Amino acid sequence: MFNDIPVFDYEDIQLIPNKCIISSRSQADTSVKLGNYTFKLPVIPANMQTIIDEEVAETLACEGYFYIMHRFNEEERKPFIKRMHDKGLIASISVGVKDYEYDFVTSLKEDAPEFITIDIAHGHSNSVIEMIQHIKQELPETFVIAGNVGTPEAVRELENAGADATKVGIGPGKVCITKVKTGFGTGGWQLAALRWCSKAARKPIIADGGIRTHGDIAKSIRFGASMVMIGSLFAGHLESPGKLVEVDGQQFKEYYGSASEYQKGEHKNVEGKKILLPVKGRLEDTLTEMQQDLQSSISYAGGKELDSLRHVDYVIVKNSIWNGDSI
């Protein structure tokens, strides 16, 4: 019964440190394996139009980071796969579940991407299960990520259908308004939902949404995530594809949700909004800081690698993280 499960979110949790066993935090290994590939960090910039484009994807792949290209320039996906493969890089794309996507997947047999993410708002559905099965039939070597979901039942069903990883999170993102528009979602209890889902998972889980600080990455891993998808922390960089806007002499970048009218091009079934974020500088600086902070987290966990984070104790202290602290 769900009412017996503790409900909390990232800001309510503090991890308890263990004895440090490394002489320098730089010795901590932040790498993670997904499928047959190892990546530098367990983070994924959200597959959103204002977060990633082909140039950002190529940069991430070249530097050893995982990425997922968004699905909103559909006709560009196949040429994108070829360009990445021609450069010796992995291809990681997104698909939806509409009828024409089946033909698209079949057309990839001659040059299959290493990763495909089935990307819809409510991933616990027959349409997603059928698409998983289709991809696995047509492209058996491709690693399939499916989502988004928010319950153990959903995780089990998608895994049983053939998904290699599931994406957990319904509406906790900064530009997602699903819980306001529909009354449903994991907003406000995303970390507890992750914990709940991970107990049922036999394959990797990707935590998606609700990440506001670098410490939230460590918390996600503690509660069962293999990787963490992040939107707002990756938005607003100089390289970000979001439109540059100047307000009162200050530069901002647009950041909007994948289910917003700005992405959809129409005001229909809108579950996202648009905000302006101050320009943050270069993406590589954020990635470096993220890695350094995660190395510090590993040192506090008393280990040398990410797995040590899974075994630390924690306390639930409501909203304690912001008591007198600012970043």
Curated annotation (Swiss-Prot):
A molecular-function term among this protein's GO annotations: GMP reductase activity
Gene giving rise to this polypeptide: guaC
Sorted UniProt keywords: NADP, Oxidoreductase
Catalyzed chemical reaction(s): IMP + NH4(+) + NADP(+) = GMP + NADPH + 2 H(+)
Enzyme class: oxidoreductase
Annotated residues for binding of NADP(+): 205-228
Coiled-coil boundaries: none
GO CC entries: cytosol; GMP reductase complex
Classification via NCBIfam families: GMP_reduct_2 (TIGR01306), PRK05458.1 (NF003966)
Name by which UniProt lists this protein: GMP reductase
Entry annotation: catalytic residues: 176
EC number, UniProt record: 1.7.1.7
Entry keyword Kinase: no
Protein family per UniProt: Belongs to the IMPDH/GMPR family. GuaC type 2 subfamily.
The keyword Protease appears for this protein: no
Main function: Catalyzes the irreversible NADPH-dependent deamination of GMP to IMP. It functions in the conversion of nucleobase, nucleoside and nucleotide derivatives of G to A nucleotides, and in maintaining the intracellular balance of A and G nucleotides.
SUPFAM superfamilies from the UniProt entry: Inosine monophosphate dehydrogenase (IMPDH)
Pfam families in alphabetical order: IMPDH (PF00478)
